[in-house]
Amino acid sequence: MIPAMVVPVLARHDLLDRMIMSINYPVKDLLIINNGARDYDYVPVWNQWIAKIWHLRIPSNLGVASSWNLGIKCLPNSDWWLISNFDVEWGGDSLKMFDELSNPNKLLLSNGAPSWCAFSIGWKVVDKVGLFDEALHPAYFEDNDYERRCKEAGIDVSDSFIPLAHDNSSTLKAGFQAKNNQTFENNANYYQNKINNKDYSSGVWSIRRRRQNSWD
């Protein structure tokens, strides 16, 4: 059984429903972090493979890193978390493979495009490396930063052959491309500064940076 699945969403909730309906393996807790709740009156579809669906309606966009962190904080007793994009489709034995290959000491990436469209992260990884850097708001470079920090900490970052169908950049195509054009460079510069300064910290969220990089 998948102990915890965390799925943030901002737009295209129809693709989230498609993802939920594609689940074909037992999931204990599915946590949906609905960053588009102000604009969409959404109710998740039912799937018999999921023991419990938790739907958090967020009044503004937390962004990727903050959403992933919130998922971990909401289900802190899980041995590991499967974090997934909303626009993937599960099929075959992909979820079973994640269950069999994941453990508390590992960061396991999918074979989707990109590989971070679904990944599992163990509690001992979070304990050693920390949470994702919420200064990288709302999207991009949070995965690069975390993988870099894991490697510095000697954590096993494992590629896999776990297949996954993924409609890449669904959020940007839903009307956020222009805003991303503004924030992408800000995040690229922030990430490069961390590299230049050999900064392996989890960063610091700030209200000024949050407002500057707003997609709201």
Model-identified regions with their sequence ranges:
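Conserved donor-nucleotide/metal-binding helix-loop-beta segment in metal-dependent transferases, i.e.
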Residues: 93-110
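Glycine-rich, basic loop-to-helix element that forms the pyrophosphate-binding segment
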Residues: 58-75
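C-terminal catalytic/acceptor-binding lobe
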Residues: 142-216
